[in-house]
Regions:
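Beta-rich carbohydrate-recognition and catalytic domains
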Residues: 21-207, 219-225, 229-266, 281-283, ...
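Predominantly extracellular/luminal regions of secreted and cell-surface proteins
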Residues: 168-180, 334-370
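Short S/T/G- and acidic-enriched coil/turn segments that sit immediately N-terminal to beta-strands
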Residues: 241, 420, 449-451, 539-544
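Aromatic, loop-rich ligand-recognition surfaces of beta-strand-rich domains
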Residues: 369-437, 447-495
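Hydrophobic core positions of the immunoglobulin-like beta-sandwich fold
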Residues: 389, 452-453, 512, 543-547
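Extracellular low-complexity, O-glycosylation-prone stalks/linkers
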Residues: 425-426, 514-540
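Pro/Thr/Ser/Gly-rich low-complexity, intrinsically disordered linker/stalk tracts
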Residues: 482-517, 550, 564-576
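Beta-strand-rich modules
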Residues: 545-566
Length: 576
């Protein structure tokens, strides 16, 4: 393997989400969110009891955002992208089919999903479950469909979900049952020999083609961005890429900086099979699938990410710290320049932790390891089970995210809301406790709730206590604590080396000197030296990545973060 020479050193101060530091803003608590989105994810009707939602699509219609996702038994609507109302749906017989898509056309919302025999439904008032079937004349079998309406009101239909077949597209006539106009065109072929991120496997290591799927089209400044997902929904490296062209049916060219939506690191990974949309203020967002995939390949959640669409640097979603608290703007924001993070650091990672009880293999240490694929489980689901974290010293706590794991449950759809009741208390000495969060009378199904404190709490100890007898185990993927740790900021990362594999140019290996006083590291990369559009969190001092383009030149940098600062100003940039 060939060691790469250092090209240039740069200084950059960054925020959590975007690439520039923002001034402090006053944000109402109900506009502060994190990922995964806190929804009443439905338990599935068969196999091991687990929740699922994936393959989301979202459109703004008559003053509300409507979001549909696979296997959810209904859909959600929101006025602000922060608070969501669930609408159960029984009038769409194909609601259980995978990968839904929706279209705003005139004063009506249209719906369809994956099917060998396409059936389309419409509703002018989707706040009510009153959908009607369209006399559909679209005759091609399809999976992972997507509608796109152009500025001239012409409508196009895209689909594709295969490790062999291409992404397809055709114009349709919505006034004539969505009859196809002309013959479908093959738009995106498989190219895993050139594009490492299309290769399947946890680390893109399997010697076969992945699945190209989940198309979506965005038009920006007269150009058409045809998005697609790869290589498989069960992987953290599941992402969305772009081809771009001047016409809705191509020809399209591959965007070198792909994938544009990508999140292999952090508490929860995955950012694929998504949908890019514009909010009512003109801001772009990407809603996508995130993976757990332990009890079933399709055990998934949804994530929401801000998107930059830059004339110079292309399109890229800001995902790295999108599972830390951030705020939903109520105005137009330049995500390339303005940071929407709350600036709260993770305080709970691998701190001393204890519990009332635990099952073997589900120890309390798994509840603050920043891995959604592992969890703590108490021996029972009885009231009185608890989990406690010692932060090591008194720190300022701003928010706590509770991520329930539903372990040993026997819940299957259809089911009543699964409601947790609990409280969280804090202490400076482990003896005298103050209640910070009271959910003892909670009636909402909120498995990933972010509790933002009205007044920051200065505590060393935090304890969550179950107050409701439940089946199975009281269990948590992670209890995540955010705030200000105080102390020294991280030093500059030293010894950073990037090596490209001589036999497979899609593979890079990175090493650097371990640093003291750090929580983790941020690896950044891109195909343009002045703008590294991708980044991920790494906790060790070495990393192998196989998701690069074979024929592209890349630039890299490495920085560190801790409980005091999430991005340091020293970054070293390397070229290959």
């Amino acid at each position: 393997m060939k060691k790469l020479a250092k090209l240039v050193s740069i200084a950059l101060v960054s925020g959590l989400i975007s690439s520039c530091t923002s001034e402090q803003v006053s944000v109402k608590n109900d506009r502060i969110v994190t990922n995964p989105i806190d929804l009443n994810y439905r338990f599935q009707p068969n196999d091991e009891s687990r929740r699922e939602a994936a393959d989301p699509v979202l459109e703004y219609f008559k003053g509300y955002y409507y979001m549909f996702a696979s296997k959810s038994g209904g859909y959600w609507r929101s006025e602000d992208l922060a608070k969501w109302e669930y609408i159960p749906c029984t009038t769409i017989p194909t609601m259980e089919d995978y990968a839904p898509t929706i279209l705003v056309y005139g004063d009506t919302l249209y719906f369809t999903a994956s099917s060998g025999n396409t059936r389309i439904y419409k509703n002018a008032h989707p706040e009510k479950d009153t959908w009607e079937e369209v006399d559909t004349k679209f005759e091609y079998p399809q999976h992972d469909p997507a509608f796109f309406k152009d500025d001239d009101e012409r409508v196009y239909f895209y689909w594709g979900c295969s490790d062999v077949d291409p992404i397809m597209g055709v114009e349709v006539d919505p006034k004539d049952g969505f009859r196809a106009i002309g013959e479908p065109k093959a738009l995106i072929q498989h190219n895993c020999d050139k594009y490492g991120w299309e290769v399947p496997g946890k680390n893109n290591e399997e010697p076969r083609q992945g699945w190209n799927e989940g198309p979506c089209v965005l038009k920006h400044n007269g150009r058409y961005y045809l998005q697609y997902a790869a290589p498989g929904t069960q992987y953290r490296i599941y992402g969305d890429g772009n081809y771009v062209g001047d016409n809705p049916l191509g020809p399209f060219e591959y965007v070198e900086d792909n994938p544009f939506s990508f999140k292999p690191g952090g508490f929860i990974g995955g950012a694929g099979h998504g949908h890019t949309f514009k909010d009512k203020y003109g801001n772009y967002w990407h809603v996508a699938s995130m993976t757990i995939s332990v009890r079933h390949w399709f055990e998934r959640r949804l994530g929401l990410f801000p998107v930059v669409v830059s004339e110079k640097y292309g399109m890229y979603a800001l995902t790295t710290f999108a599972d830390y608290p951030f705020w939903i703007p109520d105005r137009k924001v330049d995500f390339e320049k303005e940071d929407i993070s709350m600036g709260w650091n993770l305080l709970s990672y691998k701190k001393k932790i204890s519990s009332s009880s635990y099952l073997e293999g589900y120890e309390p240490e798994l509840a603050n390891d920043e891995q959604v694929e592992t969890w703590w489980a108490a021996q029972t689901g009885n009231a009185g089970e608890w989990l406690q974290i010692d932060l090591g010293k008194t720190m300022e706590v701003n928010a706590i995210q509770v991520n329930f794991a539903d372990y040993n449950f026997n819940v299957h759809a259809p089911h009543d809301p699964v409601v947790y009741q609990y409280y969280i208390e804090g202490s400076t000495n482990g003896k005298d406790w103050t209640r910070l969060v009271d959910e003892e009378k909670n009636l909402q199904d909120a498995p990933h709730k972010l509790h933002t404190l009205n007044v920051p709490a200065k505590v060393q100890y935090l304890k969550i206590c179950n107050t409701k007898d439940m089946e199975g185990s009281f269990s948590l993927f992670d209890l995540r604590v955010f705030g200000q740790g105080g102390g020294k900021v991280p030093a500059e990362v030293t010894g950073f080396q990037a090596s490209r594999d001589n036999n497979d140019k899609r593979i890079y290996r990175f090493t650097w000197n371990p640093q003291e006083n750090v929580t983790g590291y941020i690896l950044r990369w891109g195909t343009q030296k002045e703008k590294l559009t991708h980044s991920m969190v790494v906790y060790e001092n070495q990393y192998e990545a196989r998701y690069f383009n074979r024929d592209s030149e890349y630039y890299f940098s490495m920085s560190a973060f801790n409980e005091t600062l999430l991005q340091v100003s020293f970054m070293q940039s390397f070229c290959c």
